Design a protein with these regions (language model features):
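Distinct, well-ordered alpha-helical segments
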Residues: 171-178, 201-214
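N-terminal pre-domain/capping segments
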Residues: 12-156, 171-175, 179-182, 189
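Residue-identity detector for glycine
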Residues: 2-5, 9-11, 15
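Active-site groove signature of glycoside hydrolases
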Residues: 150-170, 191-204
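Glycine-centered flexibility motif
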Residues: 4, 30, 160-163
Length: 214
């Protein structure tokens, strides 16, 4: 009697089909900048949008940390979350109120070269399926700008949430995921990026808590 599945070294044989063997890849150790939002005070980073990145790279170097996970977010003036609902409004260390062009990229790449600290990925943690269609569109447009920035900086991955529409049942959310989120994944792939899903059901995605980290 033949075996249903076996490995010949190059893959797993299932019947007449060969499934490629899993090849684990090491994860780069990095420090999420959102963990310390006020390393560069907001007033300073609002005035100089790239200062926070430079200071985070230097801080990581002092900690002997090889990389940072750079946090991006809509600026408090553009976000759908009331300021009073958050301790520090938003960890937008990557500030994209103005276009992230090649001049800005050169400045950050120079800081990376000077410190020897890399960017593991860019993180934009937001509810990409939020119920309000205008807010959802604004978040999707911002995510596309994050993708473009990652590509310009030579970063190969973006990390973020999927989210949930708290006004819909789960089956409806799955439909919304296919309609709204899959196109974002295709945009990431078109730029040569991997989208890393942060598996984290935030409290703000339930009907009893509309705002906390939503």
């Amino acid at each position: 009697m033949g075996r249903k599945g076996y490995s010949d070294g190059s893959g797993i044989q299932v019947g007449t089909m060969t499934v490629r063997a899993f090849e684990p890849k090491p994860m780069r150790l990095s420090l999420l900048t959102a963990a310390l939002q006020e390393l560069t005070p907001r007033a300073q980073r609002d005035a100089d949008p790239d200062l926070a990145i430079e200071e985070w790279l230097q801080f990581a170097r002092e900690l002997d940390c090889p990389a940072i996970q750079l946090s991006a977010a809509l600026h408090p003036s553009q976000a759908d979350v009331p300021a009073e609902a958050l301790l520090d409004p938003v960890a937008n260390h990557l500030d994209l109120r103005a276009p992230f062009d090649r001049n800005r990229a050169r400045r950050i790449l120079a800081a990376i070269g000077a410190t020897g600290v890399a960017l593991s990925d860019i993180a934009y943690f937001d509810n990409m399926l939020v119920a309000d269609p205008d807010a959802r569109q604004r978040k999707h447009e911002f995510m596309l700008r994050v993708f473009d920035t990652a590509a310009l900086l030579g970063v190969d991955a973006v990390c973020g949430f999927v989210g949930r529409n708290a006004e819909l049942e789960m089956d409806q959310n799955l439909d919304l995921f296919e309609e709204e989120f899959i196109p974002l994944l295709k945009e990431a792939k078109a730029r040569g990026l991997t989208y890393r899903v942060e598996q984290c059901p935030m409290p703000g995605w339930v009907v009893t808590d509309r705002w906390h980290n939503n």
